[in-house]
């Protein structure tokens, strides 16, 4: 994830390695913008002391944002947010039961004073992009890359619209 010698700026953590298929999208979004990241399994329930140590030391290690994914009870994002001054982005990971709705509700229902920015169920890619935007707020070069990314998205939509109009035109003329 992080090229040799570069300090990670974003932590991508999850409660279990089984969350990686979802959380890999966050890592991919960060990599697309050349944002160095570290990826770790940090369980709120199985390794609470390690989780608190990770969260408390994150800023000193140079992290600027933490993306935390969890399923089920999904306490990881909130507990990390309680232990760090850094922004935390929560990713509800869908499990076999309730399709991630339980995780979403757990992550968004934070008490006053302990904010967790929350993306959609399984929305780790958007979590990565949100972290990029947070970092880009103070970095004009990164902000320019974000604008270029948005322009590419708009171009894709325009191309799809043109193709749909072409196909629909054939259907309505026949």
From Swiss-Prot:
GO terms for molecular function: 5-(carboxyamino)imidazole ribonucleotide mutase activity. It comes from Mycobacterium tuberculosis (strain ATCC 25618 / H37Rv). It is an enzyme of class 5 (isomerase). One of its GO terms (biological process) is 'de novo' IMP biosynthetic process. InterPro entries: PurE_ClassI (IPR033747), PurE_dom (IPR000031), PurE_prokaryotes (IPR024694). Belongs to the AIR carboxylase family. Class I subfamily. Coiled coil: none annotated. The keyword Isomerase applies. Pathway: Purine metabolism; IMP biosynthesis via de novo pathway; 5-amino-1-(5-phospho-D-ribosyl)imidazole-4-carboxylate from 5-amino-1-(5-phospho-D-ribosyl)imidazole (N5-CAIR route): step 2/2. Substrate binds at residues 16, 19, 46. It catalyses: 5-carboxyamino-1-(5-phospho-D-ribosyl)imidazole + H(+) = 5-amino-1-(5-phospho-D-ribosyl)imidazole-4-carboxylate. Keywords: Isomerase, Purine biosynthesis. It holds the Pfam family AIRC. Was identified as a high-confidence drug target. This is N5-carboxyaminoimidazole ribonucleotide mutase. Its EC number is 5.4.99.18. Catalyzes the conversion of N5-carboxyaminoimidazole ribonucleotide (N5-CAIR) to 4-carboxy-5-aminoimidazole ribonucleotide (CAIR).
């Amino acid at each position: 994830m992080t090229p040799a010698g570069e300090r990670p700026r974003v932590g991508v953590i999850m409660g279990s390695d089984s969350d990686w298929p979802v959380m890999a999208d966050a890592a991919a979004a960060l990599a697309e913008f050349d944002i160095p990241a570290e990826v770790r399994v940090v369980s709120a329930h199985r390794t609470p002391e390690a989780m608190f140590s990770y969260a408390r030391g994150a800023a000193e290690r140079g992290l600027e944002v933490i993306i935390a994914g969890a399923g089920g009870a999904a306490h990881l994002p909130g507990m990390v947010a309680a232990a760090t001054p850094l922004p935390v982005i929560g990713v509800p990971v869908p499990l076999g039961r309730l399709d991630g709705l339980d995780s979403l509700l757990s992550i968004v229902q934070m008490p006053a004073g302990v904010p967790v920015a929350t993306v959609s169920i399984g929305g780790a890619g958007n979590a990565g992009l949100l972290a990029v935007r947070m970092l880009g707020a103070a970095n004009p070069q990164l902000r320019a890359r974000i604008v270029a990314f948005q322009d590419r998205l708009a171009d894709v939509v325009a191309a799809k619209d043109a193709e749909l109009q072409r196909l629909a035109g054939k259907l309505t003329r026949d």
